[in-house]
Regions:
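N-terminal "assembly arms/tails" that initiate or stabilize quaternary assembly
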Residues: 1-74, 268-273
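Short, surface-exposed beta-edge/turn micro-motifs
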Residues: 41-42, 155-158, 218-219, 249
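Short helix/loop capping segments that flank catalytic or ligand/cofactor-binding pockets
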Residues: 53-55, 93, 169-172, 261-263
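Short acidic, glycine/tyrosine-flanked loop/strand segments centered on an H-E-D-like triad
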Residues: 69-91
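Alpha-helical scaffold segments that mediate packing/assembly in large oligomeric complexes
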Residues: 86-152, 270-275
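Extended, solvent-exposed, turn-rich assembly/linker loops in the middle of proteins
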Residues: 123-193
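Glycine/small-residue-rich hydrophobic helix-like segments
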Residues: 192-245
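Extended, compositionally biased alpha-helical segments that mediate assembly or anchoring
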Residues: 240-275
Length: 275
């Protein structure tokens, strides 16, 4: 097949498909945290300390809060996901095959995005482990208390990412899964969505969490507030296709430029939980 006979519409469909698949099925964590686009190599996220109100004497000066300002820096990294496609194989590709190629690149970049976010959250000093029984009601209530005592805002941006084993443990808790306790509108599977609001957190299963412990009997999970972690984006997912005459093949390259950073350790808990 001659290079000039490659359909431009095919290339455009491929590029659009990779980006849409990445947004829909790739990263599960990116949309839950702070994001900044258009970053040039390096950026700074600001962490502002707590302010305190004071009184003043009549006609007296108002004492300033003197808010603490802390800078958190992150440097972008480049990531690639490429695949060779033989020219003559184009005759064998149908729309299903193209979709497989699109999703493969999207999943690879999506997994890498979540890896960056998990790596940032792993640097937290806050922990809440349960390596004997896994998730229990007592453990979940203690997690709520930890966030409350840290004054982490209860504003709908608290999340808990758990492994599928921990998700099964949650479903065994009547307080999590029975309408007698939470109401029918808060059941774990409304319209097939695998996520649930409980105790002020959005709980959801994640298949990419690392194993831990002796013989990998535990899984490293995370509870976090969306503003406590940040993700910087220099270049979102893009795709291009080039023909290489010496291989009589096309190289499909998907790439992105991103990185993540922890902003506030009090808002991110790393949790080693029994499977």
């Amino acid at each position: 097949m001659a290079v000039s006979s490659i359909s431009t519409s095919f290339i455009e469909e491929f590029e659009s498909g990779v980006h849409m698949a990445y947004q829909r099925m790739g990263s599960k964590l990116r949309n839950t945290i702070r994001n900044r686009s258009g970053v040039k190599n390096k950026t700074t996220f600001q962490k502002i300390g707590k302010g305190f109100a004071t009184t003043k004497a009549r006609h007296g000066a108002i004492a300033p809060m003197n808010l603490d300002h802390t800078n958190v820096n992150v440097t972008l990294e480049d990531y690639f996901a490429g695949e060779w496609i033989d020219d003559l194989d184009q005759l064998r590709i149908n729309h299903d095959e193209m979709l497989v190629a699109q999703q493969s690149g999207a999943y690879a970049l999506g997994r890498k995005t979540d890896d960056l976010i998990k790596a940032a959250m792993t640097t937290t000093s806050s922990t809440h482990n349960e390596t004997t029984n896994g998730i229990t009601l007592v453990w979940a209530l203690q997690l709520m208390e930890l966030f409350g005592n840290n004054e982490v805002p209860d504003d709908g941006k608290r999340f808990v990412a758990v492994g599928w084993e921990q998700w099964s443990q949650l479903l065994d808790l009547d307080e999590f899964s029975r309408s007698n306790y939470i109401g029918e509108d808060q059941l774990p599977f409304p319209q097939g969505v695998t996520a649930k609001q409980w105790l002020g957190f959005t709980w959801f299963p994640h298949s990419g969490l690392d194993e831990a412990g002796s013989s990998n009997v535990d899984r490293v999970c995370f509870a976090y507030h969306g503003d406590a972690v940040a993700h910087a984006i220099g270049a979102d997912v893009t795709s291009n296709m080039q023909y290489h005459n010496d291989k009589d093949s096309y190289f499909v390259l998907n790439k992105m430029q991103m990185n993540s950073v922890l902003i506030d350790a009090e808002g991110v808990f790393k949790m080693q939980l029994k499977k």
